[in-house]
Amino acid sequence: MNKLLAILLCVSMVLSGCTAVNDEIQDQVFDNFGCTDTNALNFDENATIDDESCIYDGPIEILEIADIEGCDNTNSIHCMLPFPSDAFLINDQNTTTGKRIHYSSTTIPNSGTVDLVEIPILNQMDGASPNTQIMTAFEKEPDISELAGQFSISKSLENGHSTQLINRITGELIPHWVELDIRSEEDQPTILHIRTIKALEHNTPYVVTISGLTDESGELVPTPEGFAALRDQILTSSMDIENRRAEFQNLFSFIEVNTDISIQQLQTAWSFHTSSTESIIGPIISMRNDALERIGEGGLGCNVETNEEIFDEQGNRSHWLISGTYTAPQYTESFYPPTLIRRVSVTDRTPVFVEDREIPFWLVIPGTAIEEPADLTIWGHGFLGTGDTSGLYGWANENNAAMLGTSFYGWASDDVTSLEYAVLDMNYFQHQAERLEQSMINQVVMIKSFMGICSDLPDLYLNGTSLVDVTEPVYTGYSNGALRGPSIIGLSPDLNRGVLWAGGSSFSHIIERCTQYDRFHFIFASEWGYENQLDRAVAISIMQSLWDSVESDTFLHLREEGYLDEVEPYELMTLFSIGDLQISNISSARMMRTANIPILDSSTIIPYGIEVVDENHSGSVGVFFDGGYILAPDGNEYGEEPHPAHNAIGALSSARDMAFKYLQFEDIVDTCNGDCSFSPDNLSWN
């Protein structure tokens, strides 16, 4: 009886595996794999290529492998490794990709505070984030000293490189670099990161292969047992593995055809499919469009609460500081955190209007505006700050720019407590992400309102003459404001140009190298959070899907061609500081590559894969300035503050001059005179 049950079990496993084939990819290039022997118990009349899975009446050996519900059982080190993976995708004909994420109630790691972490909205995404981390782990730590690193990226394209990232549609090798997680605990396996150098294509299948990895003694790193069973055609007790056997046969066939790697050389391999643009930004585009329809061309209203005329030490007028509120349609249930966006249903992410609310703004009008109206310049503030522009009076007067700001709720000063709780209960990262989405709509509405109804406020006039030119607003943002810039410019129909200072892209790639992470890491890594770095790394990577709707990578990816009639192309100048400990230069270079922004020839570094141009170039451009500061650590850890590099370029007059010539005249002017090195002495923001 036991023998018969074993046979029936194996038959059900293999047959169920035939239904789990990636239909889209198979239809494109692959035959049907299965048992072609009519004498076998599991003969498959639809199979065209035998996959050596035939089962016969006789003794059957089954490898015992733990089958953990909701996990990728090909790697027993962690439920969600490798990541991202098709293990967490199911077919769904109602999505753009034909796929949908499926995390069960046991998939996402629990914390020391919360036993069950479920974020149902993730299961509405139609693929993996194109901006997230790619990673796996082995029982023995590999020696990666000869692999592509952050300063030797081109190695990843060489024959025989141990890691490959392949576009499954085109067969193209994707440049990347390899890094071991420096934060791993000594008694735990070390995560191996495959670092992409820019955002991946949307709605695209990718393949990862790893082969030839050795440890420090030169011995091959052991293959995870679950993957080895698939590679070596060994039947297992894991329903998950058996259900995915045909999928892996398709994967192995692709690898054999498109690489020089033999299947037996593989130490692991997996595939994943990125989400579509529609899935990533469709809901926020819907929210933006609804808000614009509600406010009309001129906006709903503005109220001034304070208007201060500020004088300098000599008694001369310096500037006006105006604060107040503007009226904006709201889609979150509450103004205060934690809060979620109201949506059509649990299966439809379309936002639903809740009410109009008054949103604070700050406006600095320079004293120079009495001679000529100041250009309306939208300001993006730093991490966990506010939209208060009062400290920008020097920038304003220097460039005759009216600096208008509002807060990035979600990453604003009043979000600190909710973020501290979110690292203990990841459910609340959805609240944080959706509050940030609402803040992007607030930005769009503020710009439209100040071009319309708010421009008629008496406080914006002196002796009947307007102090602010609202006809062609531009954007500039620093740090977090630079990260938010691409989404604001992309979402606003009134912006087409911006300057981003000390920015980068892909929050999940930025955060562990950022000194701002320090204030949350202690709680995150505590016994109440996630004591295991494997869990922390996975958690950060999962959350990227929540942040993607306003992620800089997402809208940088759309910069040149836009998206349908919803996002227009736009131009950027990106300015960075060598040695930045808050936004790593790695992430800054990623920002440029994702947006396909060339670099000015006076830049102090030329990152891999970026075109070099001179000041006669028109369009987008980037520059790295170097004040000779101590460089950031190489690994995924942050350096030691205080460290001046991050804020230095905002205090550098040549950088400000370059930025505002670009904003106001669309000119690229090499204010560095061929070399953007600078002395850290006598820098001033005002």
Question: What are the roles of these predicted feature ranges?
Answer:
Residues 1-27:
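Secretory targeting signatures
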Residues 24-59:
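Extracellular calcium-associated, cysteine-rich motifs in secreted modular proteins
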Residues 59-329, 335-336:
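Acidic, low-complexity Ser/Thr/Gly/Pro-rich repeat segments typical of extracellular/periplasmic
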Residues 184-211, 215-216, 349, 354-393:
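A conserved hydrophobic secondary-structure block that centers on an alpha-helix together
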Residues 303-373:
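N-terminal cap/lid segment of alpha/beta-hydrolase-fold proteins
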Residues 334-358, 370-462:
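Cap/lid segment of the alpha/beta-hydrolase catalytic domain
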Residues 435-438, 496-497, 501-686:
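C-terminal subdomain of alpha/beta-hydrolase-fold enzymes, centered on the catalytic histidine
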Residues 455-512:
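Primarily recognizes the serine-hydrolase "nucleophile elbow" in alpha/beta-hydrolase
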